[in-house]
UniProtKB/Swiss-Prot annotation:
Stretches with biased composition (Basic and acidic residues): 1-23
Amino-acid biosynthesis as UniProt keyword: no
Protein name: Small vasohibin-binding protein
Subunit-structure text: Interacts with VASH1 and VASH2.
Length: 66
């Protein structure tokens, strides 16, 4: 009766490992999505800042009479 009990133990562990792998994959996907959103937000902020600095530079380069 021991050999069938030994066969059942790996079967019990297999679904647990599948669940863990699924959880890890899901967590990794969420992390990747969050990082991507943060990168897009940072890119937007940096682009706005660059545009502001360029506008200020253009104002400084204009002659005072215009």
């Amino acid at each position: 009766m021991d050999p069938p009990a030994r066969k059942e133990k790996p079967k019990v562990k297999e679904p647990v490992s599948r669940i863990e792998k699924a959880k890890q994959k899901s967590a990794q996907q969420e992390l990747k999505q969050r990082q991507r959103a943060e990168i897009y937000a940072l890119n937007r902020v940096m682009t706005e800042l660059e545009q502001q600095q360029f506008d200020e530079f253009c104002k400084q380069m204009q002659p005072p009479g215009e």
